[in-house]
């Protein structure tokens, strides 16, 4: 169950074009809006997503089985329409101190600062969950996204050759980036 501080999280962010977007955690009632949002996704964007978001059953499953102990999904709304999705994935066992960040923005909401603001919100939420490290996997050709994560303090830890396979079987390299969340003892 979500702690109250996360469950009640709401943040209105201002984009570069002065538009306002609301960030809040996903709830079960977002199913139809998510189906609408992902129905617009096509082409290259589909290749990089972890799930078949065009299948309404996938979205329905997400909404019906929300488990904040495994995934904390954060949505961005422009009025009543979802324009971006970010998620914080939790691990168990020896990786329980690590969270993984994933992010997807509608094409019209890229290059306006929304992605950085959403990842910042996930960083804050991860700290509230007392995680030690955040990680992100980004295809090496996504240089602008890599730079955006670097601007937030993420560092490249490794490049994984042929780590990501597109639907056509084409292999791509991925950079593994991490952000330490706990202050070192010499910091104050």
Q: Where in the sequence are the language-model features?
A:
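C-terminal "cap" of GNAT-fold acetyltransferases
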Residues: 162-188
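Conserved catalytic-core motifs of GNAT/GCN5-like acyltransferases
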Residues: 135-138, 150-172
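Acetyl-CoA-dependent GNAT
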Residues: 51-107, 180-182
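Conserved beta-strand-loop-alpha-helix junction that forms the acyl-donor binding cleft
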Residues: 110, 136-146
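A short beta-loop-alpha structural element at the N-terminal edge
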Residues: 21-33
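Helix-loop element at the rim of GNAT/NAT acetyltransferase active sites that forms part
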Residues: 31, 36-50
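Conserved acetyl-CoA pyrophosphate-binding loop and the N-cap/start of the following alpha-helix
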Residues: 109, 113-121
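Conserved GNAT acetyl-CoA-binding A-motif
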Residues: 119, 126-138
């Amino acid at each position: 169950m979500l702690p109250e501080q996360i469950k009640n999280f709401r943040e209105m962010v201002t984009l570069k074009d002065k538009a306002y977007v609301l960030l809040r955690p996903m709830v079960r009632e977002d199913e139809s809006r998510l189906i609408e949002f992902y129905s617009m996704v096509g082409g290259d964007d589909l290749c990089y997503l972890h799930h078949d978001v065009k299948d309404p059953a996938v979205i329905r499953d997400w909404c019906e089985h929300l488990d904040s102990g495994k995934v904390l999904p954060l949505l961005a709304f422009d009025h009543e329409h979802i324009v971006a999705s970010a998620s914080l994935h939790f691990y168990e066992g020896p990786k329980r101190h690590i969270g993984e960040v994933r992010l997807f923005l509608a094409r019209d909401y890229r290059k306006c600062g929304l992605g950085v603001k959403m990842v910042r919100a996930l960083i804050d939420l991860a700290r509230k969950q007392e995680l030690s490290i955040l990680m992100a996997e980004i295809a090496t050709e996504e240089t602008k996204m890599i730079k955006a994560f670097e601007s937030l303090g993420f560092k490249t830890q490794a490049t994984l050759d042929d780590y990501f396979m597109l639907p056509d079987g084409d292999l791509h390299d991925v950079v593994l980036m991490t952000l330490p969340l706990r202050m070192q003892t010499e910091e104050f």
